[in-house]
Structure formats: structure tokens, C-alpha cells
């Protein structure tokens, strides 16, 4: 086999193209390939809980200074809130300028709401108190068996703090956890070999079930959304990255394999373990990566934030529902809260949108039926934007903590293949971060 075809990047790219062709030419057959994509994502999700647990626990235990843990967590939450607010505002502004729903003149009473009933029902059941209580698992084990990211994160933080109080015994327990984590990453390497199959099945199903022709009527919204996500990544995140001392273009090239995996599966979670590995390899301190990345997957959903404001205004425009500036700002305020409630919920984007429309009362909830058919096609842009945003956030916060080896980062982003980063003790003596404990997987 030629060397180029051994690259995961090339294999996934070929799989995506083949999936599109199969779904287009043989729709029924393509729709039947859904288990391939679902199976691959389930294999990845099977590993996410133990990886996040070990990564967060290791990060907190290695910091030892509880004040530093609080400082990093505080910086992360402030960063997430500011950047996601920017994303919400950008979506609002673009939707007002482009008016993707203008001229559709849809009567909400004529829409079939049966397909969206499960989303509106879930939205009505999710209050703020329910969301906060949901973070607390019923048992220590249930968080892992259910794969709830927020619950795993809570247990991991508590466990990490507990180990810092156990002295020598805590170090022994930590060594065992890190050994298990190493084994999990070996399993991840096995699973990643199946990535092209998963991407092929997921893409064939998407095109086979929804088709390309059905997108024509709503194509303007999709194009506007994709363009807005690109604008956000290259302008907003690009400026943030430049301020932090690295190029967004080089960073995207560095994570290109992971981005293709996200594109093929429409799930940013599918590449979460590899993002952790690559950020450590690039010179970010393990303790910062372990705290920021899992938290970002729950609270730093830039792509989802853009989607929420654009979809809300699209429905209002399509149903001829006039929204004053005050009402739009009110929707923005509600979204600042409800967008955080999307964390760890299956179908989170649609449920959060339904919750927002129900809360504000100005926009007909029945309008959700307009975008249900194309929501699956917009999920790729949401997932890609969320993924890049979390990578940038981690590097920015690591640099602010002097936990980033900037020289190593530049060399890695310039395409150099480096050995594992220097040992942690030597890195801490220089005030720099530490990299990966092993070679970067292909």
C-alpha cells in the first residue's frame, strides 16, 4: 500500500467521499449503513469517561496547589462565557443582515409538529434546578455507566482534590490511575483504526436518508450558518490565537486529522481523546489540559451558540414574527443561560433551542419543524467550530498560566516531528509546560 494511504487523514477523507457517493447513488443502502457510524461513535464514547476521569484527576493531583486549580477553573469559565457571548452576538447580527428566513411566509398552524414533540417535551422538563441536580450522579458508578460528561467531571474534580489530601497513598493511587489511562489510550489506538469505516457509514446514512435535493429550499440558511462559523473561527478565534502567540491556520493544520474525524461523524466527542493527546504533545501542561478540555466540552460550545441565535431568528423571519431590538436582546439573555444547559444532553442543540423558544414566548415553537430536516447537515459545522474553539481555549489558558512551552508549540505547528516533551520536573523549573508521555499516535 502506498505510504499516503496509510495516513488516517487520507483514509477518513476517502471514506467521507465514498459515503457521499453511496448515499447519493443508493439511498436505501446508504441509510442501512447507519450502524457503522453509530457503532464507531459508541466505541469512542465508551472510552471518554475513563479518559476524562484520569486526565482531570491527574491534572489536579499534579498541581497540588488547590488555589491554582481554582484559578485555572475560574479563568476557563470566564473565557467560555465571554467567547460564547461573542458567538451568540455574531449569530444574531448575521441573521439580521442576511435574513435567511425572509420571504418564506410560513403559517405556524400548518406545520407538522409531531416530529419535534420529543424535543419540546424534553425542553419543558429541563428547569435550572433540574439541570443543577442532574450534575450530581445517583452513585459514583452511574456517572460512568451512563456516560454523562458533567457527572464524570464532578466526580473527577472531587477525586482529584481527595488525592491531594492523601499524601504518599494518594501518589500510589494516582500512579495506578495513570497506568489504567495508558491502557485506555492503547485501546483508543485500536478503535481509531476503524475511523474510516465509521465516517463512511455516518456520511452514507446522512446523504441516503435526507438526500441532497431536499436541502435546496433551506440552503440559504445552511450557507449562512457555515459562513458564519468560518467567520468566527478565522476572525474571532484567529485574533484570540494571534494574541496568544500562534497562528489559527497552523493550528487547524495541526489538528486536521481530528477535524476530518469530527466532520465524518458529526460529533466533536469522537476526537476528544486525541485532542487531549495533541495539546499535551504541543507543549500544554497536562494539568491545564485535563481541566480545560473536559470543561470546554460542556460549557464552551461556540458553534452551538451561533446556531441557536441564527436558528431562532430564522424561525421568526420565516413565520413573519417581528422581533424588536429589546426582544432580540431578551432572547440573547435567555440563550446565555440555556446554552450552558446544553451540556451533556443528547440532541442538546435542538432541545436548547426548543427551551429558548418556549421561554421567550415571542417565536412560535412549531417553527422548529422548519429546520428539523436540515439540522443534521448543520451539525458538522457546529461540531467543528466547538472542537477548534476548545483547542484554542486550552492553549490560551495554558499560556496565561505560564503552562505552555511556546517554543515547542511553534515548532510543532511548523510541522516538526518532535520526541515526547521534556520531563515535568525540568519543565516546571523553566516555568514551561510538559508534553506527551509517549509518541504521538498517527
From Swiss-Prot:
InterPro entries: C4_dicarb_transport (IPR023954), Na-dicarboxylate_symporter (IPR001991), Na-dicarboxylate_symporter_CS (IPR018107), Na:dicarbo_symporter_sf (IPR036458). One of its GO terms (molecular function) is fumarate transmembrane transporter activity. Responsible for the transport of dicarboxylates such as succinate, fumarate, and malate across the membrane. It is a multi-pass membrane protein. GO terms for biological process: L-aspartate transmembrane transport. Its main location: membrane. Residues 420-442 are annotated as: Disordered. It is found in: Cell membrane. The keyword Cell membrane applies. GO terms for cellular component: plasma membrane. Belongs to the dicarboxylate/amino acid:cation symporter (DAACS) (TC 2.A.23) family. It comes from Deinococcus geothermalis (strain DSM 11300 / CIP 105573 / AG-3a). This is C4-dicarboxylate transport protein. Keywords: Cell membrane, Membrane, Symport, Transmembrane, Transmembrane helix, Transport. The chain crosses the membrane at residues 10-30, 40-60, 77-97, 149-169, 185-205, 221-241, 288-308, 354-374. The lineage of its organism: Bacteria, Thermotogati, Deinococcota, Deinococci, Deinococcales.
